[in-house]
Every structure is written in C-alpha cells, then in structure tokens.
From Swiss-Prot:
Residues modified as Phosphothreonine: T87, T238
Assembly and oligomerization: Homotetramer. Interacts with H2AZ1.
Lineage, top ranks: Eukaryota, Metazoa, Chordata, Craniata, Vertebrata
Protein's UniProt name: Fumarate hydratase, mitochondrial
NCBIfam families according to UniProt: fumC_II, PRK12273.1
Organism listed in the record: Sus scrofa (Pig)
Highest rank taxon of the organism: Eukaryota
GO biological process entries: arginine metabolic process; DNA damage response; DNA repair; fumarate metabolic process; homeostasis of number of cells within a tissue; malate metabolic process; positive regulation of cold-induced thermogenesis; positive regulation of double-strand break repair via nonhomologous end joining
C-alpha cells in the first residue's frame, strides 16, 4: 500500500513538469522531477517578491513595487482607502502643482543651507512631477485624510526615490534624499496641500476656464452684432411681449458671460495667496524667517502667475473661503450658461411645430427611431455641465464650512470639485461655441410671421388711447381671431391710418 501511494505521488509530480522544462545542467539534480520535489513550497512566492522591494514607515515594513517611485506610506494608503477606484484618484493638476511647490521649496531650502547636491536632485525630480512625466506613480484617491497628508507623502516619496535614483542610490533607502527631512523640509501637509490647491486652481482657471468663457463671449458678441437689425417679438413669463431685436436679446447673453469672467477674475486675488510657510497650525514652526515669502515668489516665477504669501496663515490652513468664493463665481456662471443654453434651444425648437426663430447647426443624428430628427445636443451638454457645477458648489460649500479649529479637513474633496467645475465650464464653453453658437442662423421668415401676429404690439397704443382701450382691442382680437388693426378700427378707437402711424415695431425698441 505504501509503495502504491509513493508511485501515485510520483506520477502526479511528473504531470506537473512542463514539456519545455530544461534538462539537468552542471551541478544540478539528475532530473526535472527531482528539482521540482526539492523546491521549497514557497518558492513561487519568493520568486514573485523579486518584483518588490521592502520599505518602512513608522508602522512597519511594506512591499513596494520595484517599478514605482512611491514608498511605504503610499502603499499603506492604497490599503486603507480602497474607495472609488481609478476614477477617484487625486486630480493630476494637484500633483503637478505639488511638483511646482516642492521645486520652489527645495530652491529656497538650498538658500538656507540644504546640501546643493540634494537640493538640485530634488528640483530635477520635482520638475518631472510638474511636467507630468511621473503621473503613473500617484495612485491615491481623493477620499483619504482631509488634510491630504497621504498625497503630500506620496509626492515626497516619489521625489525622494527619483532623486535617489538620479544620484545613483538605492530606491527605498531614503539616502541620500529623505522624503521628510529633505523633500518636505520646512513644510507640513497642512500648508503644502492648500498651497497645491491654490496653484492647481489658478492654473486651471487661466488655462481652461477663462479662455473658454472668453471664446464664448466673443462668439455671442459677434452674433449680437449680426442680428442687430432683426426685429422679433419678446417674451416674458414665456408669453408674448413687446418687440426687441434678436441682437438685443443676444446682447443680454454677452453681458452675462462678460460678468461671469469679471466675477471669476475678482475671486483670483485670494486664490493667489499661498499657505506655504504656515506648517502645522499656521505659526511657521520649523521654518526660517523669509521662507514663506521666498517660496511664494519662486512659485510665481515658475507659473507666471502673481502668487504671494498669505497674510494670515491661520486663515489659510483652517478656512478655504477663497475656494468657496471661486466656486461661487463658477456656480453663478453655470446659472448664466443654463439660461443661455435653454433660450437658444427653445428659440430653435421645431423645425415645424416649435418657435423656430433660430436655425441651429445640425451636428449628428438625433434619434435611433425617428429618421431625420436632429436635436440641440450642444445646448443639452451645456445644461448638464451647468447642473454638475451647481452640485459641485454644494459640495465645496459644505467642505468649506468644515474648518475645525486650526485645520480644514475637507481639502481633497474641495479641490476635486473646484477643478472639475473649472475644467467642465471651460471645455463646455468651447464646445458650445464651436459646435453651436458660431453656426446659429436667424429664421427671419418665421420671426416676422410671429411678430406680426403678436397681440402685444397693442402696447404702442397706450400713450394714444389709454391702457383700458388698448387692452379691449387685444382681448377682442384674441377672442375673434382677428388682427389688432381690424379690431381697433371696428371698435371705433382709431382709424387705419392712425394704427399704421402709431404701431411700428421698429419704433418700439427703446425710449423716445
């Protein structure tokens, strides 16, 4: 029986040997079978460990992938905050902003005595972070500590290990460049993360949001001028009102976008104030006199934006009213764009059963069942963006209100939503401009028909026959389905000649 069991075990081992297994080499055991039998049971696990290195934080050792520059604290964060997946990672603009900040801090720290060799390596590695060359080494999600400490350490570890590599050292050794002692020198997560937030927000506003809104403003302004001589009926409460020009109607949209740009720019001076130098609670512990001012100046030079040190670091760490203010300006912008997009799609409704005063560009098929149907898709996309921005602002508002004592602890969520709003509004403004606004045409035949049929032209008679008689004309004409002119003459309130003289749409476009 024992012999049978041994034979069975041997046959099972033989079945596990791959056909391509190499023959015995010098000094090897006599067969592939014996090599397999002699291999320790955890050999596969040990072999897989070759792709990892061991790093340490204050809680102990962790395995870190050899192809990543981050370290133990980043790995621990990925273990502790498995929330949302890849789509919820810290926004890349924040990571790039950290690269700018860490470079500036290293340069200033060198002025205060940091070894130039270490400082230069940090600066080079930080530049790579700022340029987006190391994006794959930042796996952390937004949903972490409210101060952003894990992301600050992720940045410190990546820059440290990349700098170590540049200097020919061993990844994970923290020598000669230490993530805390050197990369994070004179800094705390409590002041670096809000600094990165402001840098990221300012860059996004200048690179995406303001250019997009300016493009939309200019296109709407061009349409306002193009439509300046087209007289149409106005509408209030969605009901017919007195005339105006299509150009005047569009001029309202132009002014809304102009004010949106003005509001956003007005919020920026507070965004340009940087918390760097406040360290843990705003006192500047472990920094040198002048560090905060010098870092802000370096960041300004690196970005070309007028950053300055925050005049009060306690406010800069504990409250993020500046981000709430900027988000509020974007929320107002979203309200404006919602109105503009809705007006344009309603004025373009039809083509035969709607208002039909505007002819909108036809960009793609609109229905999977109704042949030939085309929809106002750019308007719909813009209104959805507006709704999202409004929702983002609610989250930012709640986050901004949660500054507890010396620290706000909703930082990652706040900047995620601020950046999301800025990017969405900027991109949507460009898309709406290029794919809708520039191609809008006026349907003058339809506009003239609706204007001539409107009962509200009777308003021009008020100064001549009084409100009550004018109202009687309008109501009688509506009830009988007759024209204003015929009804006015029939009621004996005026002659046909008087009606033609007093009721002229072109004379109803402004004060006299």
């Amino acid at each position: 029986m024992d012999r049978a069991l041994r034979l069975l075990a041997r046959s099972r081992c033989l079945s596990r040997v791959p056909a391509s297994a190499p023959g015995p080499g010098p000094g090897s055991s006599p067969s592939g079978v014996s090599r397999l039998l002699l291999r320790p049971p955890n050999a596969a696990r040990m072999a897989s460990q070759n792709s990892f290195r061991i790093e340490y934080d204050t809680f102990g050792e962790l395995k870190v992938p050899n192809d990543k520059y981050y370290g133990a604290q980043t790995v621990r964060s990925t273990m502790n905050f498995k929330i949302g997946g890849v789509t919820e990672r810290m926004p890349i603009p924040v990571i790039k902003a950290f690269g700018i900040l860490k470079r500036a801090a290293a340069e200033v720290n060198q002025d205060y005595g940091l070894d130039p060799k270490i400082a230069n390596a940090i600066m080079k590695a930080a530049d790579e972070v700022a340029e987006g060359k190391l994006n794959d080494h930042f796996p952390l999600v937004v949903w972490q500590t409210g101060s952003g400490t894990q992301t600050n350490m992720n940045v410190n570890e990546v820059i440290s290990n990349r700098a170590i590599e540049m200097l020919g050292g061993e990844l994970g050794s923290k020598k000669p460049v230490h993530p805390n002692d050197h990369v994070n020198k004179s800094q705390s997560s409590n002041d670096t993360f809000p600094t990165a937030m402001h840098i990221a927000a300012a860059v996004e506003v200048h690179e995406a949001l303001l250019p997009g809104l300016q493009k939309l403003h200019d296109a709407l302004d061009a349409k306002s001028r193009e439509f300046a001589q087209i007289i149409k009926i106005g509408r209030t409460h969605t009901q017919d009102a007195v005339p105006l020009t299509l150009g005047q109607e569009f001029s309202g949209y132009v002014q809304q976008v102009k004010y949106a740009i003005t509001r956003i720019k007005a919020a920026m001076p507070r965004i340009y104030e940087l918390a760097a130098g406040g360290t843990a609670v705003g006192t500047g512990l472990n920094t040198r006199i002048g560090f905060a001012e010098k870092v802000a100046a370096k960041v300004a030079a690196l970005t070309g934006l007028p950053f300055v040190t925050a005049p009060n670091k306690f406010e800069a760490l504990a409250a993020h009213d500046a981000l709430v203010e900027l988000s509020g300006a974007m929320n107002t912008t979203a309200c404006s764009l919602m109105k503009i997009a809705n007006d344009i799609r309603f004025l373009g409704s039809g083509p035969r059963s709607g208002l039909g005063e505007l002819i909108l560009p036809e960009n793609e098929p609109g229905s999977s069942i109704m042949p030939g149907k085309v929809n106002p898709t750019q308007c719909e996309a813009l209104t959805m963006v507006a709704a999202q921005v409004m929702g983002n602002h609610v989250a930012v508002t709640v986050g901004g209100s949660n500054g507890h004592f010396e620290l706000n602890v909703f930082k990652p969520m706040m900047i995620k939503n601020v950046l999301h709003s800025a990017r969405l509004l900027g991109d949507a403004a460009v898309s709406f401009t290029e794919n809708c606004v520039v191609g809008i045409q006026a349907n003058t035949e339809r506009i003239n028909k609706l204007m001539n049929e409107s009962l509200m032209l009777v308003t021009a008679l008020n100064p001549h026959i009084g409100y009550d008689k004018a109202a009687k004309i309008a109501k009688t004409a509506h009830k009988n389905g007759s024209t204003l002119k015929a009804t006015a003459v029939e009621l004996g309130y005026l002659t046909a000649e008087q009606f033609d003289e007093w009721v002229k749409p072109k004379d109803m476009l402004g004060p006299k």
